[in-house]
């Protein structure tokens, strides 16, 4: 079972999981980055993009989406079988932005999926290079996590919108594999399971027959992934209960919501990786940098160094603040949507604001938006320090937390105490400890009650100067604890809509 002693590093998940040493892992991840870079260079040639246009993040997103769609076999099969008007199942495309006579113009391009697949494979030495595709999915997911607060999705499944810090990876496609599962938050897994159980309640045949067997094994697999994220025996035992249920129903939904709430204090292990847009990797490869030879890691200094030396541009709407747009993308690049803003401000070297205070909408431009008033500007993606990404939830303690988001999910392995609003979280746990999971519930509540405010997480870990590549001199930051720590504070972020 996934959680029992088979903890693999994300790089191993990203590299087909053979046990490899650090150098092999770095080379293997580098090879994946090379492939994305080469593909992007080729696509810029196909689309006749200038250097500036190729570094435009909106063009990068369109190209990334095209290749993801070209390899989405289930959807492609579905489109073939259910032809819809005006949609060619064999083609993929999107908006490409070009600078014409001093104005930005939108051009809709359409390509054969077969052609895109050919270009992708050619850039990846003939392989399908699924890991490169997953890498782009995680970048899109991180961008969504930073841009949207999934209030509606949480409410629909019976959870509380203040639990948004558990929702990392909630927009990742099902096909994102082990690397995708590693970056999903506890709330995301709970939401997927609840949706599944609800279908089973409404559809008598969901668990039955040949298909039902597949459904059941998917259900158990998801339970095991979630179990592997929990760090306490009681939370894991609860997941065993949910997994072994003969006929999952409302009792299981209750247990899942309970375990999600408990994760606000007894945080799960969620992986974090810095996945950058293709328009960062492309120019680096074009300049002659050999990622495979030099080696690359998604969780160390490498993405920070790469961003220090990259030029990325973005379209800006008339009333948007380019600095705010930069913050949004910077947070997405480091998978830091649910990290403590005080720590982010320290690492970035400029103040990082809550989502609701940002004068910026998402990065993507809708097809009905007016291009005449669009400007473009440079995204400031550099940082003052770098820090190691974590896959642990850190341990817990109490802090004044905000109305909008009542806990954090740490991204960086840096010493601090983690803010959460204990009274708010605990208020959700009154009463209901009866039923078959009563002993586990009581145990979980006891542990949460015991979480101490003064406890420090990631003791002794610090941030590093960008010149300190080997991470030899940790700098432990000191924080002004009176500042607001959470990003989705009493917020008005847009909703994410599929």
From Swiss-Prot:
InterPro entries: Flu_NP (IPR002141)
One MF term in the entry's GO annotations: RNA binding
Chief place where the protein resides: virion
One cellular component (GO) term of this entry: host cell
Keywords: Capsid protein, Helical capsid protein, Host nucleus, Host-virus interaction, Ribonucleoprotein, RNA-binding, Viral nucleoprotein, Viral penetration into host nucleus, Virion, Virus entry into host cell
Subcellular compartments: Virion; Host nucleus
Ranges for region Disordered: 1-21
Motif Unconventional nuclear localization signal, residue numbers: 1-18
Keyword Ribonucleoprotein: yes
GO biological process entries: symbiont entry into host cell; viral penetration into host nucleus
UniProt motif (Bipartite nuclear localization signal) ranges: 198-216
PTM (free text): Late in virus-infected cells, may be cleaved from a 56-kDa protein to a 53-kDa protein by a cellular caspase. This cleavage might be a marker for the onset of apoptosis in infected cells or have a specific function in virus host interaction.
Function: Encapsidates the negative strand viral RNA, protecting it from nucleases. The encapsidated genomic RNA is termed the ribonucleoprotein (RNP) and serves as template for transcription and replication. The RNP needs to be localized in the host nucleus to start an infectious cycle, but is too large to diffuse through the nuclear pore complex. NP comprises at least 2 nuclear localization signals that are responsible for the active RNP import into the nucleus through cellular importin alpha/beta pathway.
Similarity-based family: Belongs to the influenza viruses nucleoprotein family.
Record's subunit section: Homomultimerizes to form the nucleocapsid. May bind host exportin-1/XPO1. Binds to viral genomic RNA. Protein-RNA contacts are mediated by a combination of electrostatic interactions between positively charged residues and the phosphate backbone and planar interactions between aromatic side chains and bases.
Protein's name according to its UniProt entry: Nucleoprotein
Gene: NP
